[in-house]
C-alpha cells in the first residue's frame, strides 16, 4: 500500500527530526525514548545499534558483567557482529562456563572467514580448540551435572546448566531447568537468571513466556534495561 508506506516514512522522518533536536539540547532521556520508537517501529539495525550503545553507556550499567548479554541482544535484533566482537563474545561465553555457545560462535566465525586470519589467527584457533574440548566434556558429564544441580541447596547450578543446555540447542530442557532454578531461590543474581529465562524462552519460540520473564526483570544495573529492549523487539511489527 503506497499511502501506508508514505505515512510510515513520514512518521520515521518526524521521529528523526525529534531525535536530532533532543540530541542537540542534550536531552538524553528523550533521545533514548525516541530512538526506542524508531528501532521498534522500523526494525532497522542502525537504530538498534545506536539504541543499544546508548543504553550501555547509561550511568550504573554493569557493562563488563553484562557484555555477553549485550552481544546476545545485538545478535537477536539482527546486528552483524565484527570479528573482534565475535572473538570477545566467544571468550566470555567460554569463561562463563558455556563452551558450546563459544564453539558455535567460533565455528560460524571460521566458516564465514571472519576469524582465523591476521594477528588473531593463533588466538582464535586456540580458543576454538579449548571451547570444542570443553563442550565435549560437558556433553559427556551432563547427567551427573544435572543430578548434582538438582541436589544443590540453591538454584544457581540449575540456571547455569539450563543456559548450557540452551547453547547446545536443547532450549526446552534448558527452559525447564532455569525455571526450576529460579523457583529454588538462593540465586546470586536473580535478575540475570530472569533475563536468561526470557532469552531461552525466545530461543524456544515461546514469545509469551519470554515476555513474562523479561517483564519480571528488575534492578538498576542494566539487566532490566536489556529486558526492556527485548520486549521492544518482541512487540515490534
Which residue stretches match the model-derived regions?
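Alpha-solenoid repeat junctions
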Residues: 55-59, 110, 131, 235
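Feature captures outer-membrane beta-barrel proteins of Gram-negative bacteria and organelles
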Residues: 19, 35-38, 57-58, 74-75, ...
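C-terminal soluble interaction/assembly domains
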Residues: 153-237
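Generic helix N-cap/helix-start motif at coil->alpha-helix transitions
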Residues: 5-17, 25-32, 42-52, 63-67, ...
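Alpha-helical repeat scaffolds
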Residues: 1-2, 27-41, 63-76, 101-110, ...
Amino acid at each position: 500500500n503506497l499511502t501506508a508506506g508514505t505515512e510510515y516514512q513520514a512518521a520515521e522522518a518526524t521521529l528523526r527530526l525529534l531525535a536530532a533536536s533532543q540530541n542537540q539540547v542534550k536531552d538524553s532521556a528523550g533521545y533514548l525514548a525516541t530512538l526506542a520508537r524508531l528501532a521498534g517501529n522500523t526494525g532497522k539495525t542502525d537504530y538498534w545499534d545506536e539504541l543499544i550503545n546508548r543504553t550501555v553507556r547509561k550511568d550504573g550499567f554493569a557493562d563488563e558483567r553484562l557484555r555477553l548479554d549485550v552481544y546476545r541482544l545485538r545478535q537477536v535484533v539482527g546486528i552483524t557482529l565484527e570479528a573482534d566482537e565475535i572473538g570477545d563474545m566467544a571468550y566470555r561465553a567460554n569463561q562463563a562456563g558455556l563452551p558450546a555457545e563459544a564453539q558455535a560462535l567460533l565455528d560460524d566465525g571460521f566458516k564465514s572467514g571472519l576469524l582465523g586470519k591476521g594477528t588473531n589467527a593463533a588466538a582464535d584457533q586456540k580458543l576454538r580448540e579449548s571451547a570444542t574440548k570443553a563442550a565435549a566434556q560437558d556433553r559427556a558429564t551432563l547427567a551427573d551435572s544435572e543430578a548434582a544441580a538438582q541436589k544443590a541447596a540453591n538454584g544457581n547450578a540449575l540456571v547455569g546448566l539450563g543456559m548450557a543446555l540452551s547453547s547446545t540447542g536443547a532450549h526446552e530442557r534448558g527452559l525447564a531447568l532455569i525455571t526450576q532454578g529460579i523457583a529454588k531461590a538462593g540465586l546470586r543474581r536473580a535478575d540475570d537468571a530472569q533475563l536468561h529465562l526470557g532469552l531461552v524462552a525466545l530461543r524456544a519460540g515461546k514469545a509469551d513466556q519470554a515476555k513474562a520473564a523479561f517483564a519480571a526483570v528488575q534492578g538498576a544495573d542494566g539487566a532490566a534495561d536489556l529486558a526492556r529492549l527485548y520486549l521492544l523487539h518482541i512487540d515490534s511489527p
